């Protein structure tokens, strides 16, 4: 027996299917479902009188190794590879498969390995968008509370450096020295996110740098406040090449030890991740943005300049003074701060993101950036470009799928690839850690509905705990069981260097989190940045600061209004 349903009714019951379109929050961005892996008429739905009952959608007697621990039914999976309607199966804290879940004895087309049994929990994904947990690659570990803000926003992996509110950490993302690396790995062991630490990379001799990597650092950070000279750049990159870790860099704003071309020469074609590539966050003034045209450079932005608005320039001066230990009464300190803030390059940054020439987005947490706004600022930038530049010429169909996938990749798969984590996190693929974020479309980019860590709900929108049901106000983001006790260690990862694992250093720290070595950090290039691999020929006018890509002037107007803003955060 068959029954016909119109699209609206079907979407209300089972979620959108192929060809349906969904608006993201209050943005101008519209996604369209590319394909549906579920089976019409045999959809999995949980609840009273619904499908997932014993002998119906739930199998009896299936081998335990084939039964899912958790199924997310009928979710709209948004990933850098496309937009797919699917059941998502999780087993052992990892994504087992995307496809059709259920009881193969009673249902058609059940994907192998996606059997629902008595050991299976269910999350109803109908009408929800599912993405990978975000990867923030520019964390100043100033306060541990950042982790809670990050996971509440949909970020599940934090990479960076620091030792707390020390003056050095307030300015630089470095965890200097083997002892600090060990202590910070131990201190962050209780935080419900994946962690990776960057050691200090500023030295003209390699011994101190290698020591930090062998203690567990997943990379090294070169920062101008510690002296980013050509000699330090070369030494740091040599150590990174030997030990297979990434190098992140904040270049010399004052051009004291060299200009942009000198740093590019010191890179010598070797892989390097350039932080806040536009330059307001730091870097050769006024033309560090030129590195967007270098094939060995992996460029990222931090969120203080994202997107360019009528308030962006005014906001930056005070932030710079505080973060970089400047004295506003000293003319030279004020000149240093003002040299980094340029309307023209900030405007160009918007356009370069839209072209896919800046590949990643990050926070610069508590050091000019806001750790809980990486996701929001990314989608605000995408919306601004959609409104000001129109549809991308490469788009197909009446949707913004390419632009949406491009911006999603900036805070998921691309930082994971850049830092050697993509075998574990960064996308919704079988075998990867089940760090997943579920969104109501109306709240997409602003407030996640559920955040899963290693397949267990760690954060969620939750109502009054003394209420009779979960939904009474105030409904706010709250920690769940995945963020508590020994579940944190069972569902999260401490990323370390391979050298530290092989040398046995990190095994002695007594960490509850699983130790995972980064790998494949060297030999990467812009070509490896998914949907963000554009390599334009870059020019910056030293007098007017105008930026051109392939001869085209990059210009856009500052936004006076943004989506995903005050209407979402009244309380």
Curated annotation (Swiss-Prot):
Compartment(s) where it occurs, according to its Swiss-Prot or TrEMBL record: Cytoplasm
EC number in record: 3.5.1.5
Domain of life: Bacteria
Pathway: Nitrogen metabolism; urea degradation; CO(2) and NH(3) from urea (urease route): step 1/1
GO biological process, any: urea catabolic process
Listed cofactors: Ni cation
Binding site for Ni(2+) 2: 221, 250, 276
Keywords: Cytoplasm, Hydrolase, Metal-binding, Nickel
SUPFAM superfamilies xrefs: Composite domain of metallo-dependent hydrolases, Metallo-dependent hydrolases
GO CC terms in record: cytoplasm
Binding site for Ni(2+) 1: 138, 140, 221, 364
Oligomer status and interactors: Heterotrimer of UreA (gamma), UreB (beta) and UreC (alpha) subunits. Three heterotrimers associate to form the active enzyme.
Family as reported in the entry's similarity comment: Belongs to the metallo-dependent hydrolases superfamily. Urease alpha subunit family.
Protein name: Urease subunit alpha
Gene that encodes the chain: ureC
């Amino acid at each position: 027996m068959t029954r016909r349903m119109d699209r609206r009714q079907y979407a209300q019951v089972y979620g959108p299917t192929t060809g349906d379109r969904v608006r993201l929050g209050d943005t101008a961005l519209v996604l369209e479902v590319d394909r549906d892996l579920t089976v019409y008429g045999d959809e999995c739905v949980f609840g009273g009188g619904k499908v997932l009952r014993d002998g119906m959608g739930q199998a009896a007697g299936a081998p335990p190794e084939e039964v899912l621990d958790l199924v997310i039914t009928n979710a709209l999976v948004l990933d850098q590879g496309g937009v797919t309607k699917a059941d998502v199966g999780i087993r052992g804290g990892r994504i087992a498969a995307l496809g059709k879940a259920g009881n193969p004895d009673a249902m058609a087309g059940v994907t192998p390995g996606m059997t629902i049994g008595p050991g299976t929990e269910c999350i109803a994904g109908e009408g929800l968008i599912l993405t990978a947990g975000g990867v923030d690659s520019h964390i100043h570990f100033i306060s541990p509370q950042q982790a809670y803000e990050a996971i509440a926003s949909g970020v599940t992996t934090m990479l960076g450096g620091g030792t707390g509110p020390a003056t050095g950490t307030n300015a630089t993302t470095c965890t200097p020295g083997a002892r600090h690396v060990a202590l910070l790995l131990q201190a962050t062991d209780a935080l419900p996110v994946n962690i990776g630490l960057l050691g200090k990379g500023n030295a003209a001799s390699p011994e101190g740098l290698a020591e930090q990597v062998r203690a567990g650092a997943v990379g090294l950070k070169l920062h101008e406040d510690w002296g980013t000279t050509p000699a330090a750049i070369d030494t740091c990159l040599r150590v990174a090449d030997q030990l297979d870790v990434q190098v992140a860099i904040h270049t010399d704003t004052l051009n004291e030890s060299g200009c942009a071309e000198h740093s590019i020469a010191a890179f010598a074609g070797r892989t390097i991740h350039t932080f806040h590539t536009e330059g307001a966050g730091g870097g050769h003034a006024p033309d560090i943005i030129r590195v967007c045209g270098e094939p060995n450079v992996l460029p990222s932005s931090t969120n203080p300049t994202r997107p360019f608005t009528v308030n962006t320039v005014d906001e930056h001066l005070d932030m710079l003074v505080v973060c970089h230990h400047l004295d506003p009464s000293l003319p030279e300190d004020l000149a240093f701060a003002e040299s980094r803030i340029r309307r023209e390059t900030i405007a160009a940054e918007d356009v370069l993101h839209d072209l896919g020439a800046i590949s990643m987005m990050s926070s610069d947490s508590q050091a000019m950036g806001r750790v809980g706004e990486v996701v929001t600022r990314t989608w605000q930038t995408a919306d601004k470009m959609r409104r000001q530049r129109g549809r991308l010429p490469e788009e197909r169909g009446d949707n913004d799928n390419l632009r949406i996938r491009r911006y999603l990749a900036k805070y998921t798969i691309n930082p994971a690839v850049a830092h050697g984590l993509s075998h574990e996190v960064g996308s919704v693929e079988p075998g990867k850690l089940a760090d997943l974020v579920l969104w109501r479309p109306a709240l997409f980019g602003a407030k996640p509905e559920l955040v899963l860590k290693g397949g267990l709900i760690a954060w969620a929108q939750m109502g009054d705990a003394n209420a009779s049901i979960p939904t009474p106000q105030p409904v706010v983001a709250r920690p769940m069981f995945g963020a508590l006790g020994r579940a944190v260690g069972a569902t999260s990862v401490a990323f370390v260097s391979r050298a530290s694992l092989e040398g046995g250093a990190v095994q002695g720290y007594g960490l509850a989190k699983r130790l995972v070595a980064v790998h494949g950090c060297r030999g990467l290039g812009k070509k490896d940045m998914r949907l963000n691999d554009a390599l334009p020929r870059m020019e910056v006018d030293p007098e007017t600061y105008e930026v051109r890509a392939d001869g085209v002037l990059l210009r856009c107007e500052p936004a006076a209004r943004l989506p995903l803003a005050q209407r979402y955060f009244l309380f």
